[in-house]
């Protein structure tokens, strides 16, 4: 989460979705929320010019920064050369294999000001490494945080929220105004905490099937379940699960999606077209 580019000679790049965080009050509040410790494995995605990085390093923990902008990596190495526990990797976080940065015995705490233009696919990518993650703290567009934390029946509720809440405890911590960044974005941001479950409270029989069901259900979110899921499950089967085929997908909670997914997994013949 980069600092204001004052006296650095680096302009934020629109193609990288860069908005450098410079409000020290916001930075301090983020660090208090994270509460980093000296023995922890901290991984920061998109550090920018290192405003948050610096505060994380002061905790004494190891900090590995994953930065795509090749002009920023030498700036970061120079700025933090006095911290032997700092390392920067020039890579695209959307394609990066985070397994090389953690082990089950030394899980990582993921932190980042995620580029708004790729935040949703990046979150899905990061969730694939959840077994090596202690927790995640992300600055995101407020609308994305609302979707992550949304409950059934809310306008923001959809595929992202259902799947994130299957894997993690999701907490919206606080909002951040545009003025905290340089350049200022046009929208409000928010900090979210994602804490992966050791075991999902509502474990399904097959996650790939759950993913398919949720994706299909919300592909046409204004249509009823009997229409959106007709390739996967019959109306009679939905009724046998005590689920009304006439309701829209945003009315279903995670337990109902898990029930549908388990049924679809157990009855593969119904998937044949």
Curated annotation (Swiss-Prot):
It is an enzyme of class 2 (transferase). PROSITE patterns: RRNA_A_DIMETH (PS01131), SAM_RNA_A_N6_MT (PS51689). The keyword Lipid biosynthesis does not apply. One of its GO terms (molecular function) is 16S rRNA (adenine(1518)-N(6)/adenine(1519)-N(6))-dimethyltransferase activity. Its main location: cytoplasm. Coiled coil: none annotated. GO terms for cellular component: cytosol. Pfam families: RrnaAD (PF00398). Its EC number is 2.1.1.182. It catalyses: adenosine(1518)/adenosine(1519) in 16S rRNA + 4 S-adenosyl-L-methionine = N(6)-dimethyladenosine(1518)/N(6)-dimethyladenosine(1519) in 16S rRNA + 4 S-adenosyl-L-homocysteine + 4 H(+). Keywords: Cytoplasm, Methyltransferase, RNA-binding, rRNA processing, S-adenosyl-L-methionine, Transferase. S-adenosyl-L-methionine binds at residues 19, 21, 46, 67, 92, 113. It is found in: Cytoplasm. Specifically dimethylates two adjacent adenosines (A1518 and A1519) in the loop of a conserved hairpin near the 3'-end of 16S rRNA in the 30S particle. May play a critical role in biogenesis of 30S subunits. HAMAP family: 16SrRNA_methyltr_A (MF_00607). Belongs to the class I-like SAM-binding methyltransferase superfamily. rRNA adenine N(6)-methyltransferase family. RsmA subfamily. This is Ribosomal RNA small subunit methyltransferase A. The lineage of its organism: Bacteria, Pseudomonadati, Pseudomonadota, Gammaproteobacteria, Oceanospirillales.
């Amino acid at each position: 989460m980069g600092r204001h580019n004052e006296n650095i000679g680096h302009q934020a790049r629109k193609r990288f979705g860069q908005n450098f965080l410079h409000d020290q009050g916001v930075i301090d509040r983020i660090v208090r929320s994270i509460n980093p410790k000296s023995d922890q494995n901290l991984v920061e995605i998109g550090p920018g010019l290192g405003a948050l990085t610096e505060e994380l390093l002061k905790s004494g923990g190891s900090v590995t920064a994953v930065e795509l902008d090749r002009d920023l990596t030498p700036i970061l190495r120079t700025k933090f050369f006095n911290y032997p526990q700092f390392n920067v990797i020039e890579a695209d976080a959307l394609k990066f294999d985070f397994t090389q940065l953690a082990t089950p015995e030394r899980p990582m705490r993921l932190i980042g000001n995620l580029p708004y233009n790729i935040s949703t696919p990046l979150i899905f990518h990061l969730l694939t490494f959840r077994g090596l993650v202690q927790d995640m703290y992300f600055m995101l567009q407020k609308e994305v945080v609302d979707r992550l934390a949304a409950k059934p029946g809310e306008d923001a509720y959809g595929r992202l929220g259902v799947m994130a809440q299957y894997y993690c405890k999701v907490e919206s911590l606080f909002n951040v105004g545009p003025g905290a960044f340089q350049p200022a974005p046009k929208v409000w941001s928010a900090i979210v905490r994602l804490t992966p479950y050791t075991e999902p409270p509502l474990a399904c029989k097959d996650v790939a099937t759950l993913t398919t069901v949720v994706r299909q259900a919300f592909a046409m979110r204004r249509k009823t379940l009997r229409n959106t899921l007709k390739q996967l499950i019959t109306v009679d089967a939905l009724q046998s699960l005590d689920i009304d085929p006439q309701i829209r997908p945003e009315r279903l909670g995670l337990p109902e999606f898990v029930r549908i997914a388990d049924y679809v997994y157990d009855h593969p013949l119904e998937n044949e077209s």
